[in-house]
Regions:
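Solvent-exposed beta-strand/loop surfaces of large extracellular or lumenal domains
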Residues: 473-498, 517-523, 712-726
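Aromatic, loop-rich ligand-recognition surfaces of beta-strand-rich domains
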Residues: 642-714, 728-774
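C-terminal beta-rich recognition modules with glycine/proline-rich loops and embedded aromatic residues
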Residues: 227, 286, 348-357, 362-455, ...
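Aromatic (Trp/Tyr) and acidic
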Residues: 21-106, 110, 139-163, 201-222, ...
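Short, conserved beta-strand segments of beta-strand-rich sandwich/propeller modules, principally
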Residues: 464, 506-508, 746-748
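Helix-terminus loop motifs that line ligand-binding clefts
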Residues: 92, 106-141, 297-305, 363
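Asp-box/WD-like beta-propeller blade repeats and closely related beta-sheet repeat scaffolds
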Residues: 135-147, 154, 170-202
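Bacterial N-terminal signal peptides
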Residues: 6-16
Length: 774
């Protein structure tokens, strides 16, 4: 995998296929709210730069190579091999159809036809198109992921029908919709949609989105009535209270059980309900959710969620199941909806951040595989068709996001054309007055900040050319036909040039690409991250120098830009994933000696089977070279000095001592001023420190083999008792700042163990014990 990546991508000639040039089936019901920015058909925008290379990799190496028999297997042989196995075919149809419209690939179209007709073949007479059995072995109908599967079958088939014009499959969609209307509702004898799936009904409730699409496509009011029922059901005592909580508390972590993917899927449905009915409070629901995520729950890499859920404010783990790819995709979709509905550039800003960083970081550059979680440090674990399980939810979701990119990369609004994402390529746009404008973009962005866009019109035409000026760009210039022009941002956040345009007019944008240092906060105190333009950078063992340095050896001596001396340079062949890929020179400290290393983009980091890290410590954890011990051996196999917060040790041995401790001793004295403890795991029979007798204490050895002396306590450790862990979370970190720097031969944390629901024993756990000079 390490060497052939560039060979695989280079072998895919961009632009060799022509767009499908389709005319989608029109909707019979007009939306109450017209989009301010128009969703573009994928054949209108062709991207050939870095984004385009990732799109083509996804289309050719994943979507076109899927085995239709695998997608249909769980329908042919009910029940499915996974409880959610039925979702994959609808997700694939959605992504493949969009990709086919963009490329016109005839082989992909053949496979789409085969899959779509093959799926409908297994629809039962009553309209059922899931993978569950009536006898409930092993899954009973209308439980777990059954409605969810119908959601994705509707999304996939509706997309296929609209773009191919194959109306013969529309009745299958209506039969599904009619069955759902018959089964669920608040009338006597019908099932409650809240109790028909996991996650407080949010999985089944996400059927809202395609039912509204089905309503607008067919004009059948019963589908709108069903959608209104779903909204009512959410507010019942057993419902997730999505609308009321987001209007009143404005916190996504308080909605339902906080499950991010399902919740964001429901919120996308709410955008469709607002678009369909015009109820202004529904838009406010979505804006409140967006603002809460952006301000308190978003990784700066452009995704959200940890362990698949929204958590307390700023609770963003670096390693614990970070940013499920399904959540990344749903976050991108929400921003696309809000960009359409409001026309505001702040949503396009989020799109760029997500696409260039966390979305592409989850995708193997060759397009063949996707990560389920994409951690901020560690290794990426990719899944493809040869993985076990052979199809994960994220492997099916990722290509959907990639296929959606051209739909809003460029767009039109009531003023003219809008450019949201920058990549080489062309966009053929139709103004509101019916005239055609073609934009041809020449750039190697984001490797260079120069972007030249040629505007071609059928005749001299007045309209506004709107460009998104990235928020990170401190210096931006705009030229029109070679001459500088001053443009101010409008209320929508875009810089607009309003004039009568002629064929061949050129707009030149220059954004100053420069490094930025991001200071770590909360659990990342004592660390920095580095960005270059829109790109998040990472240290990867694949580019750490001839010595093959381990990632744990790297620290930042001085965090100012002058000392770091970050400079872009062409990527070496072994890590070049597209022709203009860059790596970035950076001065660091490696094993306490000055060292030059090369950083790479987060999007590419980890794709060469090596460990990587985004947050770089200002000083090295001095305990990683030590020897760890604990008060009792316990029954775990982890470590407290492996720099992995998901690995932990415990002291469980069936006894109940007054105190537990975890220690690391050193052969040579090291100067420290700060100690960090990361909690291990909270179990129903203990695993935490009981603070009823006092907060956990930090102790040190100032002589080799000497006595342990108290040096401070973990004041930020939460209030707990022997049987209650309080708000403690797995991998949560706590810090003790020492009164003054001190030379030590050992560090340990000491506290009272907990017993949970078994008072006949007590134990504690620890994921990491760290000590730093700064």
């Amino acid at each position: 995998m390490k060497i052939p990546l560039m060979m695989v991508i280079a072998a895919m000639p961009l632009g060799t296929l022509c767009a499908a040039d389709v005319l989608p089936l029109p909707e019979k019901v007009a939306c109450a709210i017209a989009d301010k920015q128009a969703f573009q058909q994928p054949d209108r925008v062709h991207l050939t730069g870095w984004i385009g290379s990732r799109m083509e990799a996804s289309a050719k190496n994943r979507l076109a190579k899927i085995n239709p028999d695998r997608l249909l297997m769980s329908y042919e042989h009910r029940p499915g091999c996974q409880s959610y196995d039925g979702e994959h075919i609808g997700k694939w149809l959605h992504a493949a159809t969009l990709a086919w419209v963009n490329t016109g690939d005839p082989e992909l179209r053949k496979k789409m036809d085969q899959v779509a007709t093959g799926l409908v073949k297994w629809q039962l007479e009553d309209g059922y198109l899931g993978t569950y059995n009536l006898d409930g072995k092993p899954w009973a109908r209308w439980t777990e992921w059954d409605v969810w599967t119908h959601k994705y079958n509707l999304i996939g088939l509706i997309t296929y029908v609209r773009y191919t014009g194959n109306k013969e499959l529309l009745p299958a969609c209506q039969k599904m919709g009619d069955l759902l209307c018959k089964i669920f509702g608040d009338e006597p004898g019908k099932l409650d949609i809240n109790t028909s799936s996991a996650h407080v009904g949010m999985a089944s409730g996400s059927i809202l989105e395609p039912m509204l699409q089905l309503y607008r496509l067919t004009g059948e009011k019963r589908y709108l009535d069903f959608a209104k029922y779903v909204l009512r059901a959410w507010e019942q005592p057993n419902g997730p209270k999505i609308v009321s909580v987001l209007l009143e508390q404005k916190r996504v972590d308080k909605v339902g059980n906080g499950k991010a993917y399902e919740m964001l899927s429901c919120i996308s449905g709410i955008t469709e309900m607002y678009r369909t009915t015009g109820d202004p409070k529904l838009l406010q629901v979505c804006l409140n959710a967006w603002q809460d995520i952006v301000s308190k729950r978003l990784y700066f890499t452009g995704s959200t969620s940890a362990a698949e859920h929204f958590h307390d404010d700023f609770d963003l783990s670096n390693t614990n199941k970070v940013a499920e790819t399904c959540v990344t995709v749903s976050w991108l979709q929400l921003n696309m909806h809000l960009l359409q509905l409001t026309g505001e550039s702040r949503f396009a800003e989020q799109l760029e951040n997500t696409v260039f960083n966390h979305l592409f970081a989850a995708q193997l550059p060759a397009g063949t595989a996707w990560a389920v979680f994409t951690v901020m440090e560690g290794k990426k674990v990719y899944y493809n068709s040869n993985s076990t399980p052979d199809v994960t939810c994220c492997l099916s979701s990722g290509p959907r996001a990639v296929a959606l990119i051209p739909c809003l990369a460029s767009s039109v609004d009531s003023d003219g054309v809008v450019v949201n994402l920058y990549d080489a390529g062309t966009a053929k746009l139709t103004l509101r007055n019916g005239k055609t404008v073609v934009l041809t973009t020449e750039t190697i962005y984001p490797s260079d900040g120069k972007i030249v866009i040629t505007v071609d019109t059928e005749s001299a035409t007045p309209f506004a050319f709107k460009a998104r000026i990235p928020a990170w760009s401190r210096e931006s210039t705009v030229k029109l036909n070679g001459k500088p022009v001053k443009v101010d941002k409008g209320k929508d956040g875009y810089a607009a040039i309003k004039r009568t345009w002629a064929k061949g007019d050129k707009v030149e944008l220059n954004f100053k690409l420069e490094p930025r240092v991001i200071a770590g906060e909360r659990s990342n105190i004592g660390k920095i991250a580095i960005m270059y333009g829109p790109l998040v950078l990472a240290a990867d063992e694949a580019t750490l120098g001839k010595e093959g340095l381990p990632i744990g050896a790297i620290s930042i001596g001085k965090p100012d830009l002058a000392s770091l001396a970050i400079k872009p340079e062409p990527a070496p062949e072994k890590v070049k994933t597209w022709p203009h890929a860059l790596v970035f020179h950076c001065n660091v400290i490696a094993s306490e000696k000055p060292q030059e290393i090369r950083l790479m983009t987060f999007a590419d980091a980890g794709s060469f089977e090596e460990s990587y890290k985004i947050w770089l410590p200002l000083s090295r954890n001095v305990l990683v070279d030590g020897t760890e011990t604990r008060s009792r051996k316990g029954d775990g196999t982890g470590s407290i000095i492996d720099e992995n917060e998901t690995s932990f040790v415990n002291t469980s041995d069936g006894t109940w001592p007054k105190e537990d401790w975890f220690a690391v001793t050193l052969k040579e004295a090291k100067t420290i001023s700060r100690v960090v403890l990361m909690h291990g795991k909270t179990l129903n029979v203990g695993g935490w420190f009981d603070t009823s007798a006092g907060k956990p204490r930090i102790q040190i050895q100032t002589q080799s083999g000497g006595e342990w002396k108290d040096a401070g306590e973990l004041k930020d450790y939460p209030a707990t008792t022997g049987d209650k862990a309080g708000p403690l979370k797995e991998g949560e970190s706590f810090q003790c700042q020492l009164a003054a720097p001190v030379e030590v031969f050992g560090v340990r944390v000491t506290g009272k163990p907990s017993f949970g629901g078994n008072p006949n024993q007590a134990f504690s756990t620890c994921a990491e014990l760290q000590a730093f000079a700064k």
